Amino acid sequence: MENLFTTKEEKTKLSLTQIDNVNLNNITRAGFYVSSGWGNNISGLPQELDNNDSRAFYLVVFSLESGSYCQQILYSFKGLIFYRATSSSNSPFDQWRKINLI
């Protein structure tokens, strides 16, 4: 099949890294992640999602190359959005904060 993407479009496509069997506290590399299974083995979740039928989500991570000043935004497949950050590679993440859109 012919490739219908231009070079510019190809460079802007998002690539999602599948995650399972991970602790979100250890994901400090900038990127786009997805946990596509409701029952995936994920720790470090917001309390509202830390049960066996709520672990499907997108995770966007912003950070410097050193892993410091890291921010995580979690978009749950249930329509909930959460945010947390750390200001140092040696510091733990802040508590998850739920973002209310209304």
Where do the language-model regions lie?
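Glycine-rich, flexible loop motifs
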Residues: 2-79, 88
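Trp- and S/T/G-rich repeat-edge/linker motifs of beta-rich repeat architectures
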Residues: 91-101
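Short intrinsically disordered terminal tails
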Residues: 1, 101-102
